[in-house]
């Protein structure tokens, strides 16, 4: 692709190949044309006809009307279309009559008309001039084809502007366009006429031979430029002598000659783009050639550029943009402006006055025309047509690619600063979308292990500072629009509906519960009540039964009662009280006042709750002062307490869920509460800090913030593929300052000049890459130059419309853990990156002074020549090749999302592949390894659509089958590592729920859905990173840690004056220094062993997870690795009584249950994949004689209802224990004793058949019961609301209906 004088040409050549010969018209055909009825004329065509108004402003003329050069009084620019039609129809009929008087039609019908003469006759007649002088020349002699020779045999004067002199016929050029009254040449959308609507725009000089032609040239030597069509000129050879001056609507420098040259050039480009061998054309070379008075070597002249570019058009060159059939004034003006822009001059073909050189490779067929001469040689074009791509409404993204060239950084920056766009108008859509990141924790506490309330964490120190408030407000504005109260209410109430009463394991919220909503307001969009109200009434909140009534109370209530929720209300009690009262409504930012209000609202909400019911209270600021009052005043008011946090924006507000309203509860402060609050406040701080990167709303981007846009604009840029131009330097520096994957190009037409804007996001990582660059890589511009489409204007949209997918969130979270937490404090200098990827993102992530060696099987897309070769190396190869490890010394290694694919490709399972890989690198003296491994670290459950765990084959199936990789258990992986590195310290890294990784999401200009956060954290637990540290002594865990079991951990330390710190999921859970040992994961005692120089920690863990341990030695953190705290064995054994000892009455049976005491157990049924509690009168886990037993009652529905004994952990049912009660399901019922019968599982009914006949329907029971059937006072049905009947002995068949 070439740019000639600012006009982009494709690398294809194409021309028409078949010429249409001159078709002479018969006399009768002319008469017919002249007498055509109004509206069906063959003499003209309206180019802009409006079918609604029947109007037009411009007409295209056809022979012989196109020979008319109107006298001033007959120019039709004051006529409408209808007036024109009427006038021309009348005049042409009159002309036909006059002609037939001189030459009767019958006698002359078949004679061929001289096309020049009939044109002159038409022009004179319409101008009301005599036509007698032309009539003798009307017809051509038989078999004569030359229309010129008969007219120029002798000198003659036909009129004052048409005459023959020295065998040359001079006559005004006819108008090819007629403009009517509504034509406005100053409007950009008007069709361009190239001046051919102006009378006397040019004089046509027809000549019969070369001698006569020379006469013309000599006559006008030194005058205006003379132009000529070389290829099959209309009716015969002629020279055009353009008039001087500029037509109205055009720039003053555009005279008639230049306009005619432009018309011919555009016509030629249009023909080249559409021509094919199946279509004949009147003229293949549509261009005009300047044959006298030109300046072919002065490339500053527009006419010279037009003439030289025309030479390329003759060869078959095509523009990259399509030429309209009838270009507008704007189109032509833009073309001429681009033509005068920068670009290479036309030097491929020499200009000759009387000839045109034709390339050997050109498809142009010149036949016997002596004006065209074949020129041998090679040219950078190929034969073919160009496919034109339509314009786009939006800018185009492009991926930067680079040449093997660089430019000086300072020079590139200088060029860039001349074209940079300052003060960009940033458009900031939403950084946060989706619903909420919801967390809930049981903080009921153990009276035997009370956490001191006064040591609970307070709010972040600068929470109320102007800067923190500004950042929280900014994030709130960048949250997608939704009714935030509704989102919170749905999460909170959905969770509350699943909570079980700790006394009987029954769901508290059953069908028909009553509810009070405190803080209800009428400020929810189009509705005058909280949106959750209607959703609850209609039953559309998942899992929540429909309440019998909902009462609303608050300051701004519309469908309830106005009430102050801090004062005792004159109301009854409710099963469920939900308070969304904001304490800041009255207290503002006064912590003391808000604490007082929160305690008061809690007191009122609990007082309105029925015994055994639920209470949810919002607390804006959960400070130690609030917790002190809560546990002092309400410790006995419920049997369990949960803390809920639906994260929607950055706030520290929480919701407290009081379970089973009571007067004898025992709520105490718990370690779980402290952990939750630490995590809550850490998350708030992280989300606040990340907003430091984001520019404020309502202001332009001045480049002050690390996140924003960089843009430069080039006008008709010269972007060669080989040379270095200032524009190339500008683009190179632009790409060096932004994230490559965010690059966009916008091409706009600015009155003919093409404005090309390059823009993309800058981030703190792009700045890191720029600092690492020694020179600036030169971009490859082939793809950019190929873009001929115009686009919409640049849109500086800071955050994308679609949130980052889970896998991208995970990568960004990994980046945070590695590049901001682990690596900087280790001060490592030489890195080897396995499977880095061709985009070389690591160069942006690592500090500029760090040496990086990258290995990947694919070639790099990054230009490594622009970086210091001593510190940045890229190896195309296989990192499983032993030769790579001998040649590349390093002290640190990473393999992120690389090993699984490599082992899968080699057909190895993970343990075998990992062992081989570690032995492979062992001789390289590596000190640190970060390996992403597929292992079920935090869960064994699949993630639908993301990771399917195939336990049979030991494979992870990613993204629905797109990729399959091996996985292994964590213990097997650690055993393989110890086999190669017995003294290695190993630490597992997963994404933290403190969301400290959002700096690499929002801070990099990505948006995220809060719905995906939980999924991403689970994903990271299935694909964690293992840090292998060969420089530190690992902690020793002689016996694996298990929840509830006391164990010892040995932690080496250089001296006693150190502190051991333990963390889980990014939250510190204990510190131990020999004096104090506060711990939220269970009782902890610590002793210093001076002989072995280690700390001996005795701990009884109270929660499962990955425990990370470090030693703080004078501010230097010494890694001691990770260890897993497992849940107790989830084995359960139930011993049922012998068949002979079964009791089929409602007295029930007892089966001994053996299971670890850690697990709280209950009996459930599975309904549509979800566990639901069983009526405790039917089956329940009870404690008798300090042992747990399953107490159950036999029922004829047992053969159709499979019950399960499940654990209830953190309000999750069946996560660890889900034992089907097959013994009960397979019961054989006797036929000689009364039996109990109830409906089966929910939403189904039962029917008893006896001897093949209906005995009784169980739901509903009939009004009249069969003999011997008795309704039981106490229901033992699966659902307690349904009835149980006792039936007499018999051989019943139970049917589910």
UniProtKB/Swiss-Prot annotation:
Catalytic activity from the UniProt record: a 5'-end diphospho-ribonucleoside in mRNA + GTP + H(+) = a 5'-end (5'-triphosphoguanosine)-ribonucleoside in mRNA + diphosphate; a 5'-end (5'-triphosphoguanosine)-ribonucleoside in mRNA + S-adenosyl-L-methionine = a 5'-end (N(7)-methyl 5'-triphosphoguanosine)-ribonucleoside in mRNA + S-adenosyl-L-homocysteine
Keyword list, A-Z: ATP-binding, Capsid protein, GTP-binding, Methyltransferase, mRNA capping, mRNA processing, Multifunctional enzyme, Nucleotide-binding, Outer capsid protein, S-adenosyl-L-methionine, Transferase, Virion
GO cellular component, one term: viral outer capsid
Leading EC class: transferase
One Pfam match: Reovirus_L2_N
InterPro entries according to UniProt: Reovirus_L2, Reovirus_L2_4th, Reovirus_L2_7th, Reovirus_L2_8th, Reovirus_L2_GTase, Reovirus_L2_MT1, Reovirus_L2_MT2, Reovirus_L2_N
Molecular function terms from GO: ATP binding; GTP binding; mRNA 5'-cap (guanine-N7-)-methyltransferase activity; mRNA guanylyltransferase activity
Enzyme Commission number: 2.7.7.50, 2.1.1.56
Gene3D superfamilies in alphabetical order: Reovirus components (3.90.1810.10), Reovirus core (3.40.50.10760), Vaccinia Virus protein VP39 (3.40.50.150)
Domain of life from the UniProt record: Viruses
Amino-acid biosynthesis in keyword set: no
Main location: virion
Transferase in keyword set: yes
Family: Belongs to the aquareoviridae outer capsid VP1 protein family.
Function, in words: Outer capsid protein involved in mRNA capping. Catalyzes the last 3 enzymatic activities for formation of the 5' cap structure on the viral plus-strand transcripts, namely the RNA guanylyltransferase, RNA-7N- and RNA-2'O-methyltransferase activities.
Protein name: Outer capsid protein VP1
């Amino acid at each position: 692709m070439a740019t000639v004088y600012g006009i982009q040409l494709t690398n294809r050549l194409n021309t028409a190949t078949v010429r249409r010969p001159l078709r002479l018209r018969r006399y009768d055909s002319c008469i017919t044309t002249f007498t055509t009825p109004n509206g069906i004329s063959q003499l003209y065509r309206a180019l802009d006809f409006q079918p609604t108004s029947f109007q037009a402003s411009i007409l295209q003329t056809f022979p012989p009307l196109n020979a008319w050069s109107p006298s001033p009084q007959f120019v039709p620019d004051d006529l409408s279309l209808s007036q024109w039609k009427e006038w021309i129809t009348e005049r042409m009929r009159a002309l036909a009559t006059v002609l037939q008087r001189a030459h009767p039609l019958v006698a002359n019908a078949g004679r061929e008309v001289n096309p020049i003469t009939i044109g002159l006759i038409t022009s004179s007649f319409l101008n009301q001039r005599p036509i007698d002088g032309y009539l003798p020349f009307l017809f051509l002699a038989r078999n004569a084809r030359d229309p010129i020779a008969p007219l120029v045999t002798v000198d003659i004067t036909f009129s004052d502007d048409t005459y023959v002199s020295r065998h040359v016929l001079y006559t005004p050029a006819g108008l090819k366009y007629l403009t009517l009254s509504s034509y406005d040449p100053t409007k950009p959308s008007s069709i361009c006429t190239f001046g051919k609507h102006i009378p006397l725009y040019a004089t046509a000089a027809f000549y019969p031979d070369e001698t006569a032609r020379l006469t013309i040239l000599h006559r006008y030597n030194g005058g205006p430029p003379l132009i000529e069509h070389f290829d099959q000129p209309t009716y015969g050879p002629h020279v055009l002598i353009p008039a001087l001056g500029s037509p109205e609507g055009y720039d003053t420098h555009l005279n008639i000659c230049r306009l005619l040259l432009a018309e011919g050039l555009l016509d030629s480009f249009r023909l080249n783009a559409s021509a094919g061998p199946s279509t004949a054309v009147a003229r293949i070379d549509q261009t005009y050639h300047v044959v006298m008075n030109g300046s072919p070597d002065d490339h500053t002249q527009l006419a010279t550029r037009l003439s030289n570019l025309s030479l390329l058009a003759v060869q078959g060159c095509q523009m990259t943009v399509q030429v309209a059939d009838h270009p507008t004034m704007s189109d032509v003006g833009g073309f001429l402006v681009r033509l005068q822009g920068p670009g290479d001059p036309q030097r491929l073909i020499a200009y000759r006055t009387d000839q045109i050189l034709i390339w050997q490779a050109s498809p142009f067929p010149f036949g016997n025309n002596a004006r065209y001469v074949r020129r041998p040689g090679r040219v950078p074009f190929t034969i073919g047509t160009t496919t034109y791509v339509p314009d786009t409404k939006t800018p185009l993204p492009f991926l930067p690619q680079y040449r093997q060239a660089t430019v000086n950084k300072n020079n590139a920056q200088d060029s860039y600063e001349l074209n940079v766009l300052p003060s960009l108008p940033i458009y900031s859509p939403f950084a946060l979308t989706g619903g909420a990141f919801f967390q809930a924790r049981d903080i009921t506490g153990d009276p035997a292990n009370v956490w001191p309330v006064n040591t609970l964490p307070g709010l972040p120190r600068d929470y109320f500072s102007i800067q923190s408030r500004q950042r929280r407000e900014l994030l709130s504005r960048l949250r997608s629009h939704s009714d935030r109260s509704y989102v919170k209410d749905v999460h909170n109430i959905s969770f509350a509906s699943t909570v079980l009463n700790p006394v009987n394991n029954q769901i508290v919220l059953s069908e028909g519960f009553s509810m009070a909503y405190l803080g209800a307001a009428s400020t929810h969009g189009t509705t005058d009540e909280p949106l959750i109200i209607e959703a609850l009434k209609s039953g559309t909140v998942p899992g929540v039964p429909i309440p019998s009534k909902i009462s609303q109370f608050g300051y701004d209530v519309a469908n309830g009662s106005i009430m102050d929720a801090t004062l005792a209300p004159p109301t009854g009690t409710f099963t469920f009280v939900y308070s969304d009262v904001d304490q800041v409504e009255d207290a503002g930012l006064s912590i003391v006042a808000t604490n007082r209000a929160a305690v008061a609202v809690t007191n009122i909400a609990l007082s309105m709750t029925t015994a055994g019911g639920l209470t949810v209270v919002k607390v804006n600021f959960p400070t130690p002062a609030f917790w002190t009052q809560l546990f002092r005043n309400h410790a006995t008011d419920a049997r369990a307490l949960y803390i809920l946090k639906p994260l929607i924006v950055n706030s520290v507000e929480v919701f407290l869920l009081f379970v089973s309203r009571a007067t004898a509860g025992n709520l105490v402060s718990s370690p779980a509460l402290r952990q939750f609050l630490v995590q809550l406040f850490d998350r708030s701080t992280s989300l606040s800090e990340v907003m430091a990167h984001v520019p404020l709303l309502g202001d332009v981007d001045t480049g002050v913030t690390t996140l924003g846009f960089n843009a430069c604009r080039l006008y008709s840029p010269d972007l060669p593929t080989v040379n270095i131009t200032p524009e190339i330097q500008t683009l190179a520096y632009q790409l060096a300052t932004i994230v490559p994957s965010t690059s966009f190009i916008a091409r706009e037409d600015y009155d003919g000049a093409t404005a090309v804007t390059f823009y993309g996001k800058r981030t703190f990582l792009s700045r890191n890459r720029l600092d690492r660059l020694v020179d600036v890589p030169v971009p490859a511009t082939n793809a950019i130059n190929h873009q001929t489409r115009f686009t919409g204007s640049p849109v500086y949209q800071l955050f994308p419309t679609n949130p980052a997918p889970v896998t991208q969130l995970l990568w960004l979270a990994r980046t945070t853990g590695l590049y901001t937490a682990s690596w900087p404090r280790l001060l490592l200098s030489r890195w080897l990156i396995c499977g880095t990827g061709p985009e070389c993102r690591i160069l942006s992530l690592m500090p500029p002074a760090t040496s990086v060696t990258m290995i990947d099987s694919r070639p790099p897309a990054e230009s490594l020549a622009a970086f210091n070769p001593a510190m940045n190396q890229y190896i195309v190869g296989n990192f499983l090749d032993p030769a790579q490890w001998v040649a590349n010394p390093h002290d640190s290694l990473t393999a992120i999302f690389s090993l699984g694919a490599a082992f899968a490709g080699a057909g190895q399972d993970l343990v075998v592949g990992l062992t081989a890989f570690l032995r492979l690198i062992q001789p390289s003296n590596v000190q640190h390894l970060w390996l992403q491994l597929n292992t079920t670290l935090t869960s064994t459950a699949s993630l639908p659509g993301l990771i399917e765990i195939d336990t049979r084959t030991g494979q992870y199936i990613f993204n629905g089958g797109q990729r399959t990789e091996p996985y292994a258990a964590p213990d097997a992986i650690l055993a393989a590592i110890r086999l190669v590195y017995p003294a290695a310290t190993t630490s597992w890294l997963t994404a933290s729920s403190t969301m400290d990784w959002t700096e690499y999401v929002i801070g990099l200009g990505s948006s995220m859905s809060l719905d995906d956060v939980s999924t991403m954290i689970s994903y990271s637990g299935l694909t964690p990173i293992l840090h292998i540290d060969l420089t530190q002594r690992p902690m020793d865990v002689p016996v694996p840690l298990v929840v509830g079991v006391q164990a010892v951990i040995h932690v080496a330390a250089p001296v006693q004056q150190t502190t051991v710190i333990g963390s889980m999921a990014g939250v510190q859970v204990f510190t131990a220094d020999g004096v104090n040992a506060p711990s939220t994961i269970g009782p902890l005692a610590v002793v210093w062993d001076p002989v072995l120089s280690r700390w001996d920690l005795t701990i009884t863990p109270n929660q499962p997870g990955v425990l990370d341990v470090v030693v703080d030695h004078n501010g230097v953190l010494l890694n001691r690795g990770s260890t897993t705290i497992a849940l107790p064995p989830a084995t359960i054994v139930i011993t049922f009584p012998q068949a002979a000892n079964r009791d089929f009455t409602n007295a029930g049976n007892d089966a001994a249950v053996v299971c670890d005491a850690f697990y709280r157990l209950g009996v459930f049924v599975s309904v549509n994949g979800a566990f639901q509690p069983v009526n405790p009168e039917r089956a329940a886990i009870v404690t008798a004689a300090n042992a747990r037993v399953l107490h159950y009652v036999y029922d004829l529905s047992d053969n159709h209802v499979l019950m399960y004994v499940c654990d209830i952990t953190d309000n999750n049912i069946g996560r660890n224990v889900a034992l089907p009660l097959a013994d009960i399901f397979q019961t054989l019922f006797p036929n000689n004793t009364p039996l109990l019968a109830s409906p089966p599982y929910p939403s189904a009914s039962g029917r008893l058949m006896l001897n093949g006949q209906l005995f009784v329907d169980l739901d509903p029971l009939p009004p009249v019961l069969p003999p011997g059937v008795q309704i039981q006072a106490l229901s033992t049905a699966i659902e307690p609301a349904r009835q149980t009947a006792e039936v007499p002995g018999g051989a019943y068949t139970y049917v589910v209906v």
